[in-house]
Design a protein with these regions (language model features):
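Mid-domain catalytic core of redox enzymes
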Residues: 24, 214-334
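C-terminal catalytic lobe of FAD-dependent flavoproteins
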Residues: 314-371
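N-terminal Rossmann-like FAD-binding beta1-loop-alpha1 element of flavoenzymes
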Residues: 3-30, 366, 370
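N-terminal FAD cofactor-binding segment of flavoenzymes
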Residues: 56-90
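Short, solvent-exposed loop/turn segments at secondary-structure junctions
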Residues: 12-13, 35-36, 99, 153, ...
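Short glycine/proline- and charge-enriched loop/turn segments
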Residues: 45-53, 179-181
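Glycine-rich FAD pyrophosphate-binding loop
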Residues: 19-47
Length: 371
């Protein structure tokens, strides 16, 4: 059988494109090299807990069209991201807000907090030359030393004095008692996990798992009139112009026979000495309860480590610097010469996308492609 579309990758971009194509009467085949659907938003149910296997994914958006679309495929809970920072046993609220400043300096009013930050910012009197100076010029030395320096150095594997200023363009400072990390109208986690949501999108569509498109390209290409490719763009072209760089993350998962480990979904470890950057406790994304509302007796934590990416590792975050941007632009020119192929998603477009941005991008693409 010849399909109208072959969709490579069953993550958010691929699943939505496949769903929309089918809704427009097109025949679709989805292939994925992993043994499961859902790409990096894959959640696995272990002991009643939906574990975010490729790192925490918290849905947030101000885009009503996107929200109305995705909530057709899942009911979302009211989870609000309120991370905690642990600096050598001292706990601080994130993002930086009045709870943070009260703990740091004992200040009680927004006026006192603003004055303290202003006083500390004055340490940098010249144009910041590196990330350390940039951060101090924005929020002062105390917050930098305790809540930014160690965490950032672990994330990037470099000293803050050797990192460019553009990594921290701005640091949100809230002079209110507000722990809600995302200032978004809509926020939450799909009840029952993301995998269930992707399964709903792919309902009635043929999916072949454990199928590596790039290793079987000619045979798979022959099956369809057009290809939607959501894998790494440089891999598609066999890295012939060079390798695009990513930041990678490594997870150590642990099942614990107790009801709670840290009492919060995310705790960032902001000192340099603790090797992990943060610990995720997955059950709190769904308030510690199973799908029937019962308390879960066990818990699962994931220690997260930043790691230097090398070819073959799982690509997580594109490194959007000038060098990689220029290389992507060259690959994009090659992609434009492939009229049968649509390149989409975080890897296909080498773009740091939040989930709502992926949804908006694929719906736009469907609009132009399928109508």
């Amino acid at each position: 059988m010849k399909y109208d579309y072959l969709v490579v990758g069953s993550g958010l971009y691929g699943a939505i494109f496949a769903h929309e194509a089918k809704a427009h009467g097109k025949s679709v085949l989805v292939v994925d090299k992993r043994p499961n659907i859902a790409g990096n938003i894959y959640t696995e149910n272990i002991e009643g807990i939906n574990v975010h296997k490729y790192g925490a994914h918290i849905f947030h958006t101000n885009n009503k069209k996107v929200w109305n679309y995705i909530t057709r495929f899942a009911e979302f809970n009211r989870f609000t991201n309120s991370p905690v920072a642990n600096y050598k046993g001292e706990l601080y609220s994130l993002p930086f807000n009045m709870y943070t400043f009260n703990k740091m300096w004992g200040v009680v009013t927004p006026e006192e907090a603003a004055a303290k930050i202003e006083e500390q910012r004055r340490e940098i009197t010249h144009e910041p030359q590196n990330l350390e100076e940039q951060a101090i010029s924005l929020v002062g030395r105390d917050i930098y030393e305790k809540l930014i320096k160690g965490y950032t150095e672990k994330q990037w594997g470099r000293d803050c004095k050797d990192l460019p200023t553009f990594i921290i363009k701005r640091l949100p400072v809230r002079l209110t008692f507000d722990n809600n990390y995302f200032n978004a109208l809509y926020q939450g986690i799909p009840i029952g996990g993301y995998t269930k949501m992707i399964a709903n999108l792919l309902d009635g569509i043929e999916v072949r798992l454990n199928t590596d498109y790039l290793k079987n390209k000619a045979a798979l290409d022959a099956l369809a009139d057009k290809i939607v490719y959501t894998g790494p763009i440089d891999a598609y072209f066999d890295y012939k112009l060079g390798t695009l760089e990513y930041r990678s993350v490594r997870f150590e998962n642990e099942l614990l026979d107790k009801p709670s480990f840290q009492g919060n979904a995310a705790v960032n470890y902001t000192d340099r000495e603790t090797p992990w950057t943060r610990i995720i406790e997955h059950k709190w994304f769904e308030f510690g309860k199973d799908e029937n509302g019962n308390d879960l007796p066990k818990t699962i934590i994931s220690r997260e480590y930043s790691s230097e990416w090398k070819p073959g590792d799982e690509p997580y975050y594109p490194v959007n610097d000038a060098k990689n941007g220029a290389l992507y632009a060259e690959y994009k020119k090659l992609a434009d010469t492939e009229p049968k192929v649509i390149f989409g998603g975080r890897l296909g477009e080498y773009k740091y996308y939040d989930m709502d941005q992926v949804i908006a991008a694929v719906l736009d693409r469907c609009e132009s492609e399928l109508h």
